[in-house]
Amino acid sequence: GETDVNAHNIEQIEAKCKGKTTIRFITMGDSQRWYDETEDFVKEVNKRDDIDFVIHGGDMSDFGLTKEFLWQRDIMNGLKVPYVVLIGNHDCLGTGAETYQAVFGPTNFSFIAGNVKFVCLNTNALEYDYSEPIPNFGFMEQELTDRADEFEKTVVSMHAHPFADVFNDNVAKPFQYYITQYPGLQFCTAAHNHGFDDRILFDDDVHYIVSDCMKSRSYLVFTITPEKYEYE
């Protein structure tokens, strides 16, 4: 089956959105166990012709089993539009992180759609010892300047937002400091909570917008225009 899924799809996203000043994308996540609902999601999205790409906010798997990732990948590959998948805390269980990296790629990555950079981060600190920095500030810092002339706005996506149970709250403030350094920060997206939420977690007007799980048959559609952003 296909490996390096994110890299292949990012090529398509970047090519498709090149030169656009308005982009429209979907966030969803936590599809673990809910295969039928995820198949229905794919059918729903395929009925639309206004979506540029989809961000899966993580937790494709329940137990980090290889077959779970492959089943979900095969379902998501049914989408007419390109998609990327973030790593969720359940995806880190057992050998899940290795499988995720083989099938989808690095756990921290970024891409540019139109004039918006999407910085996608592994925030599941609880599932790791200190062998790997979660969140990876070195990566976040590098993304501030990498391809700087190609984007004017930024969206930061993660599975678990600060103060969620698997986030390392010890670094919540430095994490937020790094995020607010990004040019034209629009908002942050997250999943994990199995419920919709839009909240400001710090004293700074940065919205964390959380998509519900697939069990609820729910997803969010974001539009970023030259003037503003909105979602439904």
Regions of interest found by a model, annotated:
Residues 25, 54, 118, 154-155:
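Hydrophobic beta-strand anchors of alpha/beta hydrolase catalytic cores
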Residues 1-71:
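N-terminal active-site segment of His-dependent metallophosphoesterases
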Residues 57-58, 122-125, 160:
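Short, histidine-centered active-site or binding-site loop motifs used for metal coordination
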Residues 30, 58-59, 88-89, 159, ...:
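Active-site glycine-centered loops adjacent to acidic/histidine catalytic or metal-binding residues
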Residues 33, 61-62, 91, 162, ...:
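Short active-site segment of divalent metal-dependent hydrolases/proteases
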Residues 4, 9, 66-153, 171-187, ...:
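Extended active-site neighborhood of metal-dependent phosphoesterases/phosphodiesterases
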Residues 164-166:
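Short, solvent-exposed loop/turn segments at secondary-structure junctions
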